[in-house]
Amino acid sequence: YPLIEDTLRHMDKEKLIEFGMNLGYNGCTQGAHIVRKIKRTENINVPWLFFLNIDSSYADLHSRYQAIFDQGKELGIYVYCLYTDGDPEKLLPLIEHNPDCAMILLCNSAAVTEDFAKAAESLNNMLIGVAYDDNTDTACLVLRDHRLLYSIYRMYTDTESDEILSGSYARFAEEMHCPFVAVLADPGCSASVRENVYKAVVGARVAQKYRTIPIDLFYDIERIGNIISPPSSIIGFKPDGSIYNIGSDGNPLEHNIFNESLRDCLLYTSDAA
């Protein structure tokens, strides 16, 4: 109850409802039905969510990337985790053009400006993930002033897990009024540290220890994928279009989304598995 009350106080209700419907119904119900059917009839492991690292330097992002979303929805994918090293504001028209999808836009805190927040106000299908660094509190304040849906995330290494395990990272997220607090292991992170972090994440979540919901962006996505259609597939696309398997330390594969259809890329990935 404290989490719900806090979220409704600081974030727009319509954004919470629309993002939640896209995630829960389009992504995990309607989309999941399509994912399971394709697995059953074509033996293709379709992910329920995938990561897309976008090169925002292109003048016409719509013509370059919209086909990926169109193909994804045909396969039952309605949840996307987007990232760019450039200006995230340039990705907003793509998000607007796919109102039936739940879009998670990962941003560096320095990229969260007043102009960005104002441009994002009209979008109800997006959650903004702010990177955890020295400027995160300022970025969260900007987003909160515009009543946008946001949370924070951090990538951790073997030497950077203490804040997560001690709970100080989650307590910071509480102070920032985040409904979610996410972690993601660096590809070089050891299996033992990853497991300890995930145990801490699940333990805190089950105990409702904080006024925020801890999430592990790898293990929880994998877990949901295994519920929808096992074995779970966790993949992403780099700015050049090459596909990589997040479950294999981000190793690139031979196939490219700009040279082949998404269905073919996933078919080859399923065959490789």
Language-model-detected regions and their locations in the chain:
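Conserved small/polar residues in nucleotide/adenosyl-binding loops
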Residues: Y268-A273
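Long, low-complexity regulatory tails in eukaryotic proteins
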Residues: F237-L262
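Short, acidic/polar
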Residues: R64-F69, L165-Y169
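N-terminal [4Fe-4S]-dependent radical SAM core
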Residues: Y1-N53, E74
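Core AdoMet radical
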Residues: L49-D60, G72-E89, N98-D137, L143, ...
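Conserved C-terminal portion of the radical SAM core fold
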Residues: I54, V79, N135-S229, I234-D240
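Leucine-rich repeat
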Residues: Y65, K90-L92
